[in-house]
């Protein structure tokens, strides 16, 4: 019973950390990375389709993404979708390839993205703490129902706290890495 609660808490905290990684991937740095375009949706025969389903995104060099669109009639729609996204990118079409140069980040945009990264990290921290609270409440309920002793509850609570500290530490490391990435010129 106790192990199930701890395992569930660990899985949920792991998912929170994974979600933070996805959120950080959407925050643009000065370098080209295919995941930057993950949020772009293309109007494909009337339906909004993720860009990855209509084009192959590769890194051409450190500041340029290259897109190979599968259906040549979709080149205009893909280009328009990238332009209208809130990423601030200006694609250039060369034949069947769309090149997306990454503009250099200004000091102001770097600070804005850093602020956004900190907000995402804080949201992840709050989520991890809520998971801890839920796990501790489940343990307290078990103790009230006399299914576990007070000592077992305290030990399991300490384990949940250690797990929380571990994941908060990982969130901090991820945030530091993202901030360093954003501030690198």
From Swiss-Prot:
The keyword Glycoprotein does not apply. Transmembrane segments: none annotated. It comes from the Bacteria. CDD domains: RRF (cd00520). GO terms for molecular function: ribosomal large subunit binding. Its main location: cytoplasm. InterPro entries: Ribosome_recyc_fac (IPR002661), Ribosome_recyc_fac_dom (IPR023584), RRF_sf (IPR036191). One of its GO terms (cellular component) is cytosol. Keywords: Cytoplasm, Protein biosynthesis. GO terms for biological process: cytoplasmic translational termination. Belongs to the RRF family. PANTHER family: MITOCHONDRIAL RIBOSOME RECYCLING FACTOR PSEUDO 1, RIBOSOME RECYCLING FACTOR. Responsible for the release of ribosomes from messenger RNA at the termination of protein biosynthesis. May increase the efficiency of translation by recycling ribosomes from one round of translation to another. This is Ribosome-recycling factor. It comes from Pseudomonas paraeruginosa (strain DSM 24068 / PA7) (Pseudomonas aeruginosa (strain PA7)).
């Amino acid at each position: 019973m106790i192990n199930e609660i701890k395992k569930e808490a660990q899985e949920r905290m792991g998912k929170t950390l994974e979600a933070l990684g996805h959120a950080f991937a959407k925050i643009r740095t000065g370098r080209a990375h295919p995941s930057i375009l993950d949020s772009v949706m293309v109007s494909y025969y009337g339906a909004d389709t993720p860009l990855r389903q209509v084009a192959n995104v590769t890194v051409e060099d450190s500041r340029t993404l290259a897109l190979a669109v599968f259906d040549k009639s979709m080149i205009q729609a893909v280009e328009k979708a990238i332009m209208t996204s809130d990423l601030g990118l200006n694609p250039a079409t060369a034949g069947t390839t769309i090149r997306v140069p990454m503009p250099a980040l200004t000091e102001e945009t770097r600070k804005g993205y850093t602020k956004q990264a900190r907000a995402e990290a804080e949201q992840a921290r709050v989520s991890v703490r809520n998971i801890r609270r839920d796990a501790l409440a489940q343990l307290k309920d078990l103790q009230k129902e006399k299914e576990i002793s007070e000592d077992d509850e305290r030990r399991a609570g300490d384990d949940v706290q250690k797990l929380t500290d571990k994941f908060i530490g990982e969130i901090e490391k991820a945030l530091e890495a993202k901030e360093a990435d954003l501030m690198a010129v």
